[in-house]
Each structure stands twice: as structure tokens, then as C-alpha cells.
Amino acid sequence: AIVEVKVPXLXE
């Protein structure tokens, strides 16, 4: 997802 690429931390 684009959001994961911009904010890796969010994904985690």
C-alpha cells in the first residue's frame, strides 16, 4: 500500500 511506503511505521 502507498501508506506503508510513506509511513512504514504505520504498518507496523
Swiss-Prot record:
Keyword Acyltransferase recorded: yes
Family in the record: Belongs to the 2-oxoacid dehydrogenase family.
Descriptive protein name: Dihydrolipoyllysine-residue succinyltransferase component of 2-oxoglutarate dehydrogenase complex
Coiled coil: none
Annotated cofactor note: Binds 1 lipoyl cofactor covalently.
Catalytic activity as recorded in UniProt: N(6)-[(R)-dihydrolipoyl]-L-lysyl-[protein] + succinyl-CoA = N(6)-[(R)-S(8)-succinyldihydrolipoyl]-L-lysyl-[protein] + CoA
Biological pathway: Amino-acid degradation; L-lysine degradation via saccharopine pathway; glutaryl-CoA from L-lysine: step 6/6
Physiological role: E2 component of the 2-oxoglutarate dehydrogenase (OGDH) complex which catalyzes the second step in the conversion of 2-oxoglutarate to succinyl-CoA and CO(2).
Top-level taxon of the source organism: Bacteria
EC class name: transferase
Molecular function (Gene Ontology), one example: dihydrolipoyllysine-residue succinyltransferase activity
Gene: sucB
Keywords assigned: Acyltransferase, Lipoyl, Transferase, Tricarboxylic acid cycle
Expression induction or repression: By 2,4-dichlorophenol.
Cofactor: (R)-lipoate
